[in-house]
Amino acid sequence: MDLRRITWIVRPWFVAAIAVVCGIALFAPRVALAHAVLVESQPGVNSTVSGPDVAVLLKYSSRIDPKHSTLTLLNPDGKVEKVTIDSQPSPEVLSAKLTGLVKGAYALQWQVLAADGHITRGRVPFQVK
């Protein structure tokens, strides 16, 4: 093996360049990689709550755009109702108020646009007693 060919690898400028690239990869903000995943909800998944009015709070793993996000409620009759999103308490949270709910099984369906530009969706089934 010719040592003259590989000695350029250990030169200080090359080591510094590798360190900079590794530093950028390790410490760069992760916002661009983070889809909005639901991390907490009120009502909770498969929970039982008292009606007729229910406060909704959905917390996600990253910032979301409320203007391009939707909430709908599937009621016990199988009908889908649009839910109005209230002002955001924080960039990762959606809130709303559900009123006039009767006893039965419901599913809160959500679709959010995350800061990374990806749309994620899901549902939170719950019961009203």
Task: Kindly label every feature range from the protein language model.
Residues D2-I18:
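Bacterial N-terminal signal peptides that target proteins for export
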Residues V20-V21, A32:
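Cleavable N-terminal signal peptides
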Residues L33-P52:
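N-terminal edge beta-strand
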Residues A55-K59, G117-K129:
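Extended, polar beta-sheet/loop recognition surfaces of beta-rich domains
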Residues V56-E81:
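Short, surface-exposed alpha-helix to beta-strand junction/turn motifs within ectodomains of secreted
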Residues K97, V102-L108:
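A glycine-anchored, Pro-Gly-centered beta-turn/N-cap motif
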